């Protein structure tokens, strides 16, 4: 058992093998049974930054990365925004554990999705690209495609996309791993059920635009923004693992 991993809330304090190993996700959204249950998992510095030199991969510890894989094993699909994929090479798969691989879902507005170069798990898990009609069609033949109609302002209907994920692709539990614009879109539209947040014991600083925060978008209206409800706290050294309900 790894030493020093403590569940400190809810009480009583106890030592655990790893955060979140025993959780099971509901099969439907909190307030809409036509939607999957959506969780967001992010790591931030103490001063709230989610990237360092444009990348998120160096923020969390080895335990944070293991925790990320634990959450992936609980979900039917893992979703990221295309900007996150463009920023660095990454994998959305599980380790070679023998478990079924989650569906990899990439959300794009432009169709600029470097699957072959930046998705390390490309070829060993099914990939679905979601985007406006023209942008998504650019990816046909390289991945499965879910093409969406857009509003006059160009916004995609993420609620309809989530409904399609559940109805067509059998996604009951969806894990979202950023980036900040996708997080903001989901939270501002009340489409995210829970937030899993790792606080890395680092201070990064940075000017606006140099180091992103967890949510990038307009200020959330006070009357409709979620009021996160703390569900659990794990402590490993100086690293915190927080779980919140967003409903």
What feature does the model see in each segment?
Residues 1-247:
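Enzymes that bind and transform nitrogen-containing heteroaromatic metabolites
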């Amino acid at each position: 058992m790894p030493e020093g991993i403590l569940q400190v809330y809810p009480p009583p304090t106890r030592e655990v093998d790893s955060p979140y190993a025993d959780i099971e996700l509901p099969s439907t959204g909190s307030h809409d049974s036509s939607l999957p249950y959506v969780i967001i998992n992010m790591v931030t510095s103490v001063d709230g930054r989610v990237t360092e030199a444009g990348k998120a991969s160096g923020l969390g510890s080895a335990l944070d990365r293991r925790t990320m894989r634990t959450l992936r094993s609980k979900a039917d699909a893992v979703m990221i925004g295309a900007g996150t994929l463009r920023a660095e090479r990454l994998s959305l798969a599980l380790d070679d554990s023998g478990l079924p691989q989650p569906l990899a879902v990439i959300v794009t507005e432009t169709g600029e999705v470097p699957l072959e170069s930046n998705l390390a798990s490309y070829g060993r898990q099914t990939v679905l690209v979601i985007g406006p009609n023209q942008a998504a069609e650019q990816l046909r033949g390289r991945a499965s495609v879910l093409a969406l109609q857009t509003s006059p302002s160009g916004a995609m209907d993420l609620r309809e996309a989530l409904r399609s994920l559940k109805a067509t692709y059998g996604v009951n539990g969806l894990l979202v791993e950023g980036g900040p614009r996708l997080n903001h879109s989901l939270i501002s539209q009340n489409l995210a059920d829970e937030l899993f947040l790792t606080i890395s014991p680092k201070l990064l600083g940075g000017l606006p635009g140099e180091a992103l925060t967890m949510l990038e978008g307009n200020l959330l209206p006070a009357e409709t923004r979620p009021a996160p409800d703390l569900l659990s706290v794990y402590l490993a050294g100086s690293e915190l693992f927080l779980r919140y309900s967003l409903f």
